[in-house]
């Protein structure tokens, strides 16, 4: 009787392993999705300029006039990036 239960346990483990190998886990799905996406969907090359703009705003009590150069640098970067994307 013990051999029957151990055989049943082994069969159950094999079924679980085969079903796990057939279905990729969530991490593998996400990894594949990320790898197949365009760079623009996850990466903004102008994010550094955006971060600097926000830091300037915080430093200057959210006075937009004090951070105009940062905003312009971000707009220029974004414009250049979108133009480059359009032609590639």
Swiss-Prot record:
The gene is cox23. It is found in: Mitochondrion intermembrane space. This is Cytochrome c oxidase-assembly factor cox23, mitochondrial. It comes from Aspergillus clavatus (strain ATCC 1007 / CBS 513.65 / DSM 816 / NCTC 3887 / NRRL 1 / QM 1276 / 107). A motif (Cx9C motif 2) lies at residues 67-77. Residues 1-23 have a biased composition (Low complexity). The keyword Mitochondrion applies. InterPro entries: COX23, Cys_alpha_HP_mot_SF. GO terms for biological process: mitochondrial respiratory chain complex assembly. Keywords: Disulfide bond, Mitochondrion, Transit peptide. Residues 43-85 form the CHCH domain.
């Amino acid at each position: 009787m013990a051999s029957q239960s151990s055989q049943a346990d082994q069969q159950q483990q094999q079924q679980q392993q085969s079903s796990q190998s057939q279905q990729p886990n969530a991490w593998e799905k996400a990894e594949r999705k990320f790898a197949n996406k365009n760079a623009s969907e996850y990466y903004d090359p102008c994010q550094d300029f955006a971060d600097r703009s926000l830091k300037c705003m915080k430093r200057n009590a959210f006075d937009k006039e004090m951070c105009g150069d940062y905003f312009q640098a971000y707009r220029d970067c974004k414009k250049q990036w979108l133009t480059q994307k359009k032609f590639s």
